[in-house]
Structures are given as C-alpha cells and as structure tokens.
C-alpha cells in the first residue's frame, strides 16, 4: 500500500483542490450598473472604476 513520503501542507493541499473548481465552474460575470461592461461580482468595475454606485478608483466613465 502506498504511503506519502512527507506531510503535505494545508496550503499545498488547498492549491491542488482549487484547480478542480477552476477547471469545472464557469466564470460568473455581472453587468456594471454604471457603464454596462461585464465585471466580476463583488469587485470594482475595471472599465469605469465604480463599485456599488461610488467611484473607488481614479478612472473616468469613458475609460
């Protein structure tokens, strides 16, 4: 019966397990209510810099 040669750290174990989800689940996107560009949920828009109705980065509305 095979035995591991050394203990695998929790970080290495979790990195390996994360690859399965990254390959199987599609990326979820939502449209920015300010400019309409597709963005990742719960993150500021890369195009206009708004999040939840407020400008959080120094970008302008036209890019």
From Swiss-Prot:
InterPro entries found in the cross-reference section: Ribosomal_bL32, Ribosomal_bL32_bact, Ribosomal_zn-bd
Molecular function GO terms recorded: structural constituent of ribosome
Gene: rpmF
Highest taxon in the source lineage: Bacteria
GO cellular component, one term: large ribosomal subunit
Biased composition (Basic residues): 7-18
Name of the protein: Large ribosomal subunit protein bL32
Record keywords, A-Z: Ribonucleoprotein, Ribosomal protein
NCBIfam families per UniProt: rpmF_bact
Span list, region Disordered: 1-27
GO biological process: translation
Family: Belongs to the bacterial ribosomal protein bL32 family.
């Amino acid at each position: 019966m095979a035995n591991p040669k050394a203990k695998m750290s929790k970080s290495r174990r979790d990195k390996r397990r994360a690859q399965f989800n990254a390959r199987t689940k599609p990326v979820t996107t939502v449209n920015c209510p300010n400019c309409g560009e597709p963005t990742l949920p719960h993150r500021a828009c890369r195009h206009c810099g708004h999040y939840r109705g407020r400008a959080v980065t120094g970008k302008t509305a036209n890019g």
